[in-house]
Every structure is written in C-alpha cells, then in structure tokens.
Amino acid sequence: MNLPRGPVMVDIAGFALTEAERARLSHPLVGGVILFRRNFHNIEQLRALTAEIRALRTPHLLIAVDHEGGRVQRFLDGFTRLPPMRVLGEAWDADRDQALKLAETVGYVLAAELSACGIDLSFTPVLDLDWERCAVIGNRAFHRDPEAVSALAEALQQGLGRGGMMSCGKHYPGHGYVEGDSHHLMPQDDRTLAQIEQDDLVPFARLADAGMGAVMPAHVLYPAVDSQPAGFSKVWLTDILRGRIGFDGVIFSDALDMAGAAGAGTYVQRADAALAAGCDMVLVCNQPEEADAMLAALAPPPQPQLAERLERMAGKSRAEDWQRLIATPDFAAAQAAVRQLAMPKDALAGPQVGEAH
C-alpha cells in the first residue's frame, strides 16, 4: 500500500501484530511505531515483527525504540548491554580523547544492532545536564558540564550514523534541572531563558549544527519563557528551536499519555496543541482506544516538510546487510569494548523510565 507517512506514532501490544493493529497502522495519519520491552521475545521474533510492520506500507512506517543504555534499554537478550551515559562522562573526566572514542563506539554498537533488526531509530542521546536534581534523568545524562555533554553526544551521534541511524536529542530544552518526573506530574523550571541558554541549550545547539536528526521536547513548564510546557510551546519549538537554533530535523512529541501532557486536555487536544506548536510527529502509547479516537478526529495542520524530514530518519540499508556486519570480528571487538563499560545492574539502578508506556 502506497501511503505517505502521517504525523502520529503509535505502539502495539505484543510480539506480533493483531488484525486491529494492522488496521490502525494502515491509517493515513499513522507514520511510525514505537516498540517496548513487551514487544521483544528474542532477536528472531523482533526481526519478524519489524519485517511485518515494514511490509504494511510504502514508504515503510518508521520503527523506533527507547534504547539509550543503562536502565533505558528495551532489548537485552542477544543485545550488547549498554552503559548509562554517566559512565562516558566519568571517562571524560579521566581522559577526554579516550572518552570520545568510547562514545562513538557505543553509538555504533547501539545503532548497528538495532539496524540489523529492522529498527530505524532510537530516541537517543539524552542531552539533559546532570544537575543532580532529577532522579528520572540521573545517570542517563552524560555530565553536568555543557561542553562535556556536547562533545560526548556529538561523538555518540557520529557512531549512530556509522551504525545506520540518525540521532534524536532529548529532552529539549533540558529536563535535568527539575526534580519531578514528567511521566507522573508536570515539572516546573523557573529559570530565565538566559540561564537556560547559558547551560542546558548548549548541547542542543551544538548537535543541531552537527546534523542531529530529531529532537524530543520535555513535558516541562518553563514559566519565565512561556505559559505552555515545552512540548506544546510555539515559543520553544518554532521561535527558539527552529528560528534561533536553526534546527530543521524532526520534532517528536514525548508520549502524550504522560502526566506532564495531561494539562493539554483530551488526546486529540494534546495532539492538536503539539502539532500546532511545531511538532512533526506525536507519540500515543498504551492507550489503543484513545489512539483510535484520536486518529478518527485529528485534523493536522499542513506539514509540507513532513515527508522529507521523516524520510531522513528512515534506515537506508537492509537489515540483512547489518546482520552481516555485526557478525564480523571488527564488530565483535567493538561490542567487547562497550560490554566492559556496562554492568547488568545498570539496567536496574534508579527509577524505571517509561516501561509502562
């Protein structure tokens, strides 16, 4: 079925598509699918699932996952265990050149293993600064220093590219300064724009200049800048991110089922607000009935650049090509280097993030 990608990303329930999910994924407003741990049994099953999703439409639906490392790594069995990004920040403090090499290698292994399973995109890297205030960010952040975060994230972005994947910086303009978790409430950051620009915005601007493919805004309120949370704010998305920073990639909303998004109203109202503010694609997870109701009622604004932006995020090589690459001795050496950085406890340390979503 030839059908342009729409501005909505949805999820699925299990290891394979149901008939209801096939119908939902064939809706003209759908443009992508986000996978979770519940969708993963083993690599063979995952490859079959992504092939099934890709076969539904041309161009294929974007297939995404939160696969950062540490406690946010959805697929474990058969995948290289990835470290939390703080490990790379600690390496930066010891030896900057070595840390940059490690960051590039982590990005490469992360992306190539996913590419070999037919996945287009991981929502990574985390560009939030580690202000030691926000538990849900915590060791997901590289460092407190904007220069360290920028350099390490840019190296990781280069590795992602080598592994066939574009980057998605999050959580714009910075989730690290607030104490609350936007999965459960609406955090508020009372700093001025000048203060945020001096620190938290630096990595976003730096990676935008270096070819970052996408950005995911935070469900955080910055009242000194705008009365709307960043993900629903034309000031943050259109005026600052598009206008001042000059970012021209995809803007994905964070999941609209999060408590931090609830203030925008119903799911249709949330999607309307996010798209009107400047998001290209909205994520609706864990609420299939709400997703269906939203798809029936949503009337998105004109998005003349949507097709081009989403196509940039799509994997360009066949999964089989990546499967051959990850079987090589050189890739095994890269996996070994990454494995030395990670411990199994990393997947459990700190609050679990978004796994219910």
Swiss-Prot record:
Known pathway: Cell wall biogenesis; peptidoglycan recycling
Site (Important for catalytic activity): D181
Catalyzed reactions: Hydrolysis of terminal non-reducing N-acetyl-D-hexosamine residues in N-acetyl-beta-D-hexosaminides
A matching Pfam family: Glyco_hydro_3
Any one Gene Ontology molecular-function term assigned to this protein's record: beta-N-acetylhexosaminidase activity
Compartments in which it is found: Cytoplasm
Keyword Cell division: yes
Keyword Cytoplasm appears in the UniProt entry: yes
This protein's name: Beta-hexosaminidase
HAMAP family in the record: NagZ
Annotated binding of substrate, by residue: D66, R74, R140, K170, H171
Function: Plays a role in peptidoglycan recycling by cleaving the terminal beta-1,4-linked N-acetylglucosamine (GlcNAc) from peptide-linked peptidoglycan fragments, giving rise to free GlcNAc, anhydro-N-acetylmuramic acid and anhydro-N-acetylmuramic acid-linked peptides.
EC identifiers of the protein: 3.2.1.52
GO biological process, one term: carbohydrate metabolic process
Species of provenance: Chromobacterium violaceum (strain ATCC 12472 / DSM 30191 / JCM 1249 / CCUG 213 / NBRC 12614 / NCIMB 9131 / NCTC 9757 / MK)
Family annotation (InterPro entries): Beta_hexosaminidase_bac (IPR022956), Glyco_hydro_3_AS (IPR019800), Glyco_hydro_3_N (IPR001764), Glyco_hydro_3_N_sf (IPR036962), Glycoside_hydrolase_SF (IPR017853), NagZ_Beta-hexosaminidase (IPR050226)
